[in-house]
From Swiss-Prot:
NCBIfam families: PRK05422.1 (NF003843), smpB (TIGR00086). This is SsrA-binding protein. GO terms for molecular function: RNA binding. It is found in: Cytoplasm. One of its GO terms (cellular component) is cytosol. The lineage of its organism: Bacteria, Bacillati, Bacillota, Clostridia, Eubacteriales. Belongs to the SmpB family. It comes from Clostridium acetobutylicum (strain ATCC 824 / DSM 792 / JCM 1419 / IAM 19013 / LMG 5710 / NBRC 13948 / NRRL B-527 / VKM B-1787 / 2291 / W). Keywords: Cytoplasm, RNA-binding.
Length: 155
């Protein structure tokens, strides 16, 4: 019997989210897709930049998640920016609702990946950074890079 591949294969990242937000918690959730969207995502035609999630009527939806139309999809293609339902347990949705009801918290998709041949979204509870926080993060990153460079040269 063949061994199942349980390795996560990242299809799209939202790198800007790490720059613009402090990530508090992450959740793994499924996403409701149409067949041609799955093919397009597997071809790497998804973009999470500027995407966010919102809770409406007890359901979580991903907004502004761009999935380019599948080129062989003809009439079966759907709107690239349509709202896609994210699949979570009710208790997780209630917890997320508690977070987002507080001021400053938002839900941001940070990764789109395959797990056991299913497309999953890594959803983060995030707090927006101020400009000075972003500058501090860049300074820390540069300092860390300098230290690593110095350590590498001393070997």
């Amino acid at each position: 019997m063949a061994k199942k591949n349980t390795e996560n294969n990242t299809l799209a990242d939202n790198r800007k989210a790490w720059h613009d937000y402090f990530i508090e918690e992450t959740y793994e959730c499924g996403v409701e897709l149409v067949g041609t969207e799955v093919k397009s995502i597997k071809n790497g035609k998804a973009n999470l930049k500027d995407s966010y999630a919102e809770i409406r009527n007890g359901e979580v939806f991903a907004c502004n998640m761009h999935v380019s139309p599948y080129k062989e999809g003809n009439i079966f293609n759907v709107d690239p920016l349509r709202k896609r339902r994210l699949l979570l347990h009710k208790s997780e949705i209630d917890k997320l609702l508690g977070f987002t009801s507080q001021k400053g918290y938002t839900l941001v998709p940070i990764a789109l990946y395959l797990k056991n041949r299913r497309v999953k979204v890594k959803l983060a509870v995030a707090v927006g950074k101020k400009n000075y926080d972003k500058r501090d993060a860049l300074k820390e990153k540069d300092a860390r890079r300098e230290i690593d460079r110095a350590m590498k040269n001393n070997r």
